[in-house]
């Protein structure tokens, strides 16, 4: 059986069933057999919450808030064609879509159900806690307006999924959790700072009155002395400028010639330095890649320890900073007042002395500038000479490195070669000869082939064998007298007791 149903001024009808694909919204409609009609109120509702959140330093606080929330309704404009007012749309398409979401949310529940309130509360508390956990307590307190706006925006994004709109959001002042007195301490600190500032302002105004009269008298004397001193300074300065410009031109010519010679040497040195730098960067990059993981682990551990230290520091600071700040500022203001009186008394005398010194300084600067340019030219030439010596040293390093590689990394063979090439053995022989000159050193004589070297019938092989037999005692004697070891390629000293 059909019946005609009309919704109230702040109500809508949600009709489902026979002949309707999803949900039909209407202010009035015929409801036929096989259809179900539900009324739902679209009036905004106030939701009061007391959100308990925690900052990134684990400081708890309360955030009282009142949100006015309901479905967003935007009536469609009346059509321009006359006589079509009965056929116009009730809602704008976007509002009708959001109202459908709201109808599906609230229709299964009773009008007095707490379902929507619990949903809204869960969204607000969740977004508030997530946002607060990413900020410090100082950031939340200093940027309260920004914090409230971000909470509002994040909550609205989530409520859009249910067709709800925040008509008004009133987030009250942040409140301390029981047992946490962060905001209370901040309030006491502000009150004490205001009282101290008032005391300082009174003292400053009294000081300005007494100092003002003295300043006027001092300025009159200072200005007279200033004019006389500036006249003398200008005269001396003009003479110094002329001498300085002349010396500057001469020095620039000399510097230009030195620079041209230096650029040629620098270009050659730069190429060699770049090659070495590229090789160094390649090796450093490999080492850095290996060490990066260990460094990152250490940094993360340091960050955890730093956060713990900051939390303890903030707690102690809140307890002790207020008293220390008041005492410090009071002592500073008293010291500043006494210091200001002494400084003003000394300024007048100092000003006249400074101006006289500036005149003498300007004349000395001209002479110093001329000497400095000459010294700079000599210094530049010496620097380039040092760079050339450095390049020679680098070439020697590369030569030694290439020789070491050619000898297969045998450091002893390289050392022997360098000593032979540098005439070290000849020099050592000369020094040893001079050291034993006039002495009677131990002299050992060995005969080849057991004293048979003089026989006419001895063969060549016996002579060679005799030479080899003489080498061990010869090397031992050299070691005893000079402490030098034979080269590795020649052989080694005989062990104690060996023949």
From Swiss-Prot:
The keyword Magnesium is annotated on this UniProt entry: no
Keywords attached to this entry: Cell membrane, Coiled coil, Lipoprotein, Membrane, Palmitate
Entries under InterPro entries matching the protein: Band_7, Band_7/SPFH_dom_sf, Flotillin_fam
Record localization: Cell membrane; Membrane, Caveola
Residue ranges of coiled coil: 243-319
CC annotations in GO: caveola; plasma membrane; plasma membrane raft
Membrane-topology annotation of the record: Lipid-anchor
Keyword Cell membrane recorded: yes
Lipidation (S-palmitoyl cysteine): 37
Domain of life of the source: Eukaryota
Maturation and modification: May be palmitoylated.
Family: Belongs to the band 7/mec-2 family. Flotillin subfamily.
PANTHER family to which the protein is assigned, alphabetical: FLOTILLIN-LIKE PROTEIN 2, FLOTILLIN-RELATED
Biological role: May act as a scaffolding protein within caveolar membranes, functionally participating in formation of caveolae or caveolae-like vesicles.
Protein name per its UniProtKB record: Flotillin-like protein 2
Biological source species: Oryza sativa subsp. japonica
Taxonomy of the source species: Eukaryota, Viridiplantae, Streptophyta, Embryophyta, Tracheophyta
